[in-house]
Amino acid sequence: MIIIVIVVFLFYFSFLNLNLNPKKKRPPSPITLPVIGNLISLLNNQPQNILFNYYKKYGKIYQLQYGIVNTVVLSEFDILKEAFIENGEVFIERYNKITKKFKSSENIVNSNGLIWKKLQSISIQELSPNIKIKKYEPMIINETNKLIDSFNEHIKSNESIDPTLNIKICFLNIIISFLFNFRYNDYKDEKVIQLVDYIHSIFRMGSHPIPQDYIPILNKFYINKTTKIHQKIFENIYEYIENQVQKRLEILNKNNNNNNNNINECFVDLLLLKFKSNLLTWNEVIKTTTDLMIAGSDTNSLFTIHLIIALTNRENIQNKVFNEILNFYILNENNKITFSNKSKTPYYNSVLKEVERRFTVSPLSQPHRTNKDIILNGYFIPSGSQIIQNVYSCHLNDKDWENPFQFNPDRFLNNNQLEKKLITFGMGPRNCLGFQFALMSIWIVNLILFKSIKFSSNKLIEEEIREGGTTLSPFPFKINLIKR
């Protein structure tokens, strides 16, 4: 009882000291409850909606108190730019939750300082240069054709289908090919379906509030059930990744012994060469590979699923996209598909951007942490604060976007500057390393998909109500596939 009284006293003493000091004006904030603060706002499985309502009331920068963790939410492009571009070094660190320590800090997503700089500099060698990622285009094209093959039996029988699983396997195969230089041949393979399920579960549970992350004293009394499940799933994925990495190491050693100069066949080979040179630890290789497989498959597949729903509900836009893509094929020499020709499909490109904006897949991005005190937009933010990039509000506010809830691809055709306000892949030095590979994959897969198949439904498919989590996923639905 005495401990609780002391905690409450210290909490309010700190709160009053910071908020009554005129030199340390804090961002506006909703009413804060003792001990738990504003944790109740996380209990909803759609926290982006709660934070969007706070944005409409308190503006582009506001403060929340999650237990003992001071949290600042940034919700418009200009304030995000001020933080992550103009003051990027202050906001560069990740905020790591206590119950996620099992993920370790030896990966590209959660690491900070020298470890992150090392992993970032190595990974960007394969993920950033266009000439490097271009070599993966034939693989992406081949996988898209395999996806279409998986739909053929439904096309022939005129059966309606939920395409979600097939699309997730397609993008998982793409990232597995990128990482390990192999793919799952059968879209009904139980192993690949299990992987898809693991990844889906990680993103569904990822946003569930765990009180111990914000009130550490609770760790002494119980372990959250969600944490146990989350940890077990990660252990299964780590085991899978380690087996695949070990296979690549054996191939690498064999090629090296045979004086085969073509030893760097995939991304993991690059990491293993650094490992063999003592530049990376084994754990860093495993954890970084895990990050890329999980992030690289889920978000891209969910984007494509949202695109299919959006264009199924808007047949006129789907037809315009098809006609432009068909014209692209006719005019394109030898029907060669390459991301470097994307300027030849302006309307299709604008549709992709509008789906990215209107149906944001990752509404709140990965949290950051300030590494020193800073004044932002006239407000004081102390060192160690959790910073949330509110992507959802940034993409749907009426200051940056005219009629933000209207699906209107033409907005990007008429204003080239709007694309800069899309922050799906983050902002600043910690933005998504693989965003160029992701954009290339999405462009190629959907170009071939909408050239080959017409998606239709007898009724409108639900767009607004989505399954919550770290990413937003449409609920199960069925559509008809018609061969073009």
From Swiss-Prot:
Keywords: Heme, Iron, Membrane, Metal-binding, Monooxygenase, Oxidoreductase, Transmembrane, Transmembrane helix. Its cofactor is heme. PROSITE patterns: CYTOCHROME_P450. GO terms for cellular component: cytoplasm; intracellular membrane-bounded organelle; membrane. One of its GO terms (molecular function) is iron ion binding. It comes from the Eukaryota. Its EC number is 1.14.-.-. GO terms for biological process: organic acid metabolic process; xenobiotic metabolic process. Heme binds at C432. The chain crosses the membrane at residues 1-21. SUPFAM superfamilies: Cytochrome P450. It is an enzyme of class 1 (oxidoreductase). The keyword Heme applies. It is a single-pass membrane protein. Its main location: membrane. It is found in: Membrane. Belongs to the cytochrome P450 family. This is Probable cytochrome P450 555A1. It comes from Dictyostelium discoideum (Social amoeba). The gene is cyp555A1.
